Amino acid sequence: QDFTIINNKINSLFSFFKKRYRFFYFDRPETDFFTRDDYFANNENDFPLKEKDKLSYIDNIHFFNKNYLYHKLKIKKNINIDKDTLVVHVRTGDIFNNDWHSLYSQNPLSYYLKISEKYEKVLIISGKNLNNPVLKLLQRYEKFSFQSSSFIDDFNVLLNAKNLASSGVSGFPIVAALMSQKLENFYHSDLYLKEHLNPEMLDGSQVTIHSYKIVDGIQPGKFKKTDENLTKLIDDDITKIIRI
């Protein structure tokens, strides 16, 4: 066997020992299971990967997703997307509720304008709640089209894109990029969290990775609903988007 599925019936008998958080922590110090405050609590966060396992996960995650998980994926569809089309995932929804989710920083308008310069068509994939202020501004540009469909349909567009871009802190486009059999170019900014799925996990020998620094971008932890941050988010100055 190339890998083992650990969620078998025997393990389920001891489910109270399972880790409850949905992310692997790739960038946090290792902790000791036996220092838990309450071994049986469901609200305890998961523990980080052990240091000895972390590099192995990161080095192999692209290969594993592309060559194994993709073939296990039951919802996949084959869609033909033009080579001159850039597909961009723009995150909306819960992170913009109330005072915004401080950790989930998103890219400004200028980022989308910069990465789309060489493309004739840009397809924006977003959630149905169009509460990201950038979306309304992008509608002014003729080359941009928009899709907010079902989870399965939207994911399959990302999965079939030859050119794909993320919008900041979000695992959705990273999963698609890791599994993709067609991806040639991936675009991202320096706004992401290393503790879970992120652009650094993509294998540069498989995909051309285009990385950008956002000058004066809203860093994770500071993404809060303020007039200053809103001004930064809708900024269209592409000179602040620097290839790195």
Label the predicted regions:
Residues 174-244:
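Nucleotide-sugar donor-binding patch of glycosyltransferase catalytic domains
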Residues 2-118, 216-244:
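Secretory-pathway luminal glycosyltransferase catalytic domains
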Residues 102, 162-166, 210-213:
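Short, charged/polar micro-motifs that form catalytic or ligand-binding hotspots
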Residues 1-2, 126:
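A short beta-strand-loop structural module common to alpha/beta enzyme folds
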Residues 113-204:
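Donor-binding and catalytic core of enzymes assembling or modifying cell-surface/extracellular glycoconjugates
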